[in-house]
Amino acid sequence: MDMNELKLMQNYPLELKVMKTKMRIQEWVDYYGEDGVYVSFSGGKDSTVLLHIVRSMYPNIEAVFSNTGLEFPEIVEFVKSFDNVTIIKPEKSFKRVITEEGYPVVSKAVSNAVRYAKKNEEEGKDTLRLRQLRGLEKGSKFNKAKWGFLLDAPFKVSDACCEELKKKPMKKYHKETGKVPFIATMAAEGGVRK
């Protein structure tokens, strides 16, 4: 799908969006089976809407919530108010992740760029990413002095937080159960999601 197709679909009326969503849900369940799928549920608006649509068709489909320990108590209570929700937890705590890997700052993309540029710099490698963060290359969203200072920050910078606290527990759940997720991701939210 290209950006023009995406823009066209974003302008569909709500009824058509819901209909297309239900068609995709049906196809997913037809392929994997009702017992072979689950809804990845964060308690946020996107996954709550997805859970509602999925369960309007298949009331018994499981939801899985990764409790990172960083959620507001109200979100955890909201998640627990739904039936058939499995709560999983990461192996590492947030404190351990930031101590071992570094802090997530600015965005996942910037944190990732800083993490690997710093690693390459420490290894004596001159990479494009490093030059971009140092402001020596043009044509990059990271080619800004405001991000370059993070290379010299007195703390580690990393995008590992989301991977360790959310993605790894979900991958482990998939490996243990063989189930595949429905994931609610809005294209309008950030460059990574487009």
Residues of each region from the PLM?
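ATP-dependent adenylation/nucleotidyltransferase module used to activate substrates
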Residues: 2-194
